């Protein structure tokens, strides 16, 4: 099964998890690049506001095409209880190209379930697996264990229902 791991990361937490997931399932890694300036305190505040208002953003054209992969795993930080504008934009653009999906998120507090539900609605696919990690978990020595469980969940779902995962 060919797998693409797509993610957006402002601070590096989601990148760390995306790299671990891609390594664990021998996947291609694609970082979404938001052209908006989200650095510093002003960028942080703008980011939360844009996420809360379900805004899209301009992203650099992806180097890989979702329709060339059997499974697309999408990762996002949770901003204002939802996905980032870059991930929203990607999921809307690739809605018809994504065959099967799995999601992961990193967060400082809560909002994983709402984030996953919004991602599901946006891309039109029910994820075959999800992984939610706190900032502390994403930086812990147990990260590989969490990721291994996520990959195992994907593999089980794929074996039970190959059409949807």
Task: Name the predicted role of every residue range.
Residues 77-80, 108:
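Short glycine-rich anion-binding loops that position phosphate/pyrophosphate groups of nucleotides
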Residues 66, 92-99, 122-125:
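Short, conserved loop/helix-junction motifs that constitute active-site signature segments
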Residues 13, 99-100, 106, 153:
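P-loop/Walker A phosphate-binding loop and immediately adjacent motor/lid segment at beta-alpha junctions
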Residues 1-2, 97-102:
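Short, surface-exposed connector motifs at secondary-structure boundaries
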Residues 1-74, 81-92, 145-165:
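N-terminal beta1-alpha1-beta2 submodule of the flavodoxin-like/Rossmannoid cofactor-binding fold
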Residues 33-35, 79, 104, 132-133:
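Residue-level "edge-of-site" marker
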Residues 102-142:
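Short, glycine-/small-residue-rich phosphate/pyrophosphate-handling segment
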Residues 74-75, 103:
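Redox-cofactor binding/interface segments in oxidoreductases and associated redox assembly factors
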């Amino acid at each position: 099964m060919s797998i693409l791991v797509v993610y957006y990361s402002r601070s590096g937490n989601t990148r760390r998890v995306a790299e671990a997931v891609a390594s664990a399932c021998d996947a291609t890694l694609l970082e979404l690049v938001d052209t908006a300036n989200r650095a510093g305190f002003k960028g942080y505040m703008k980011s939360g506001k844009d996420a809360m208002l379900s805004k899209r953003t301009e992203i650099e054209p992806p180097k890989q095409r979702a329709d060339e992969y059997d499974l697309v795993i999408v990762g996002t930080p949770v901003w204002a209880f939802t996905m980032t504008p870059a991930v929203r934009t990607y999921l809307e653009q690739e809605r018809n190209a994504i065959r099967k999906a799995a999601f992961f998120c990193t967060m400082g507090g809560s909002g994983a379930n709402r984030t996953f539900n919004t991602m599901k609605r946006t891309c039109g696919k029910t994820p075959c697996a999800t992984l939610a990690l706190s900032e502390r978990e994403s930086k812990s020595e147990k990260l590989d264990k969490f990721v291994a469980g996520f990959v195992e969940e994907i593999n089980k779902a794929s074996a039970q229902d190959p059409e949807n995962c």
